[in-house]
Amino acid sequence: MKKLFLIFMLLTPLAMAYGEREEIVVSPIYGKQKNNNDKNSPVKGVTGSGVKISFEGKAGIDDNAIMGLGMGVMYNSLKVKGKDINNNSGNLFSVPIYFMVGTGTDNGIYTKFSFGLSVANGSVKWTDKNGGSGKIKAMPLNGYGAIGIGVQKNKFSFGINGIVTPRLKRQYSSPTKRYNDKFSDSVVSLEFGYQPNYKD
C-alpha cells in the first residue's frame, strides 16, 4: 500500500501539469458482489463498492475533440459471499495511470475514453463447509479501461463511468475440486469534477 501511495504522489504532477482543463475528480464506485451458490463453479463477482480520486489534465486538439492524461488512486471492497462460505472481507487498492481521448472542450456535454496501466494490491480469503479454502489476489500490473459521459459547467463537472477493475488471480482447493485462474470484474461510478484553476 505504501508503494502504491508513493507512485501516486510522484506521478500526480504529470497529470495536473498537462492540459487546459485541470480537474480533481472524486468518483463513488458501485460494484455488485454476487452470492456464490453453486459450489461446483468458481467464485466470481467479488469486487464491491469503493471510491476513486483522480487528477486529470485535458486539452482541446481539434474543434470539440480532447486529449489528456489522468492519474488516480482507487479503492474497492473484496468479499466472497455465499450460503455455506465463511469469508474474510478484503480490500483492493490500485493506482491507474491513463491516457484520455473524447469530446467536450467547453461547457456542455463531454465524452471520455480512458486507457492505460494500473498497479494494484489486495486480497481476500475464504473457506467453505466442504473443507475447501480459497484466495483471490490482485495482479500487480494490469491494463486499465473506462468509458464515460457527463456534463461540465465552468469549474464543475458531473458524469457516469463504466470501469474495468484490475485483474484478480483466483485459487481454490478442496478434497474434491481444485482451480486456479484469472478474471476481471467491472464497476460503475459517478464522477464529480472540480477545476481549481478555472478562469472566466
Listing of model-derived features with the role each one plays in the protein:
Residues D63-M67, N107-T111, N154-G159, Y198-D200:
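Repeated loop/turn-to-beta-strand initiation elements of outer-membrane beta-barrel proteins
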Residues G108-G134:
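Membrane-proximal helix-loop-helix units in multi-pass membrane proteins
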Residues E22-P28, L69-M71, I97, T111-F115, ...:
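Membrane-embedded beta-strand positions of outer-membrane beta-barrel proteins
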Residues N35-N37, M74-K81, K135-D200:
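Predominantly the C-terminal beta-signal and adjacent terminal strand-loop region
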Residues E20-E22, K44-I53, M67, N87-I97, ...:
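Residues that define the transmembrane beta-barrel architecture of outer-membrane proteins
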Residues L4-P13:
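Sec-dependent N-terminal signal peptides
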Residues P28-K34, G57-A59, V73-K79, F93, ...:
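Transmembrane beta-strands of outer-membrane beta-barrel pores
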Residues A17-V73, K79-K81, V187, E191-D200:
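Short glycine/proline- and aromatic-enriched beta-strand/turn motifs that initiate or cap beta-hairpins
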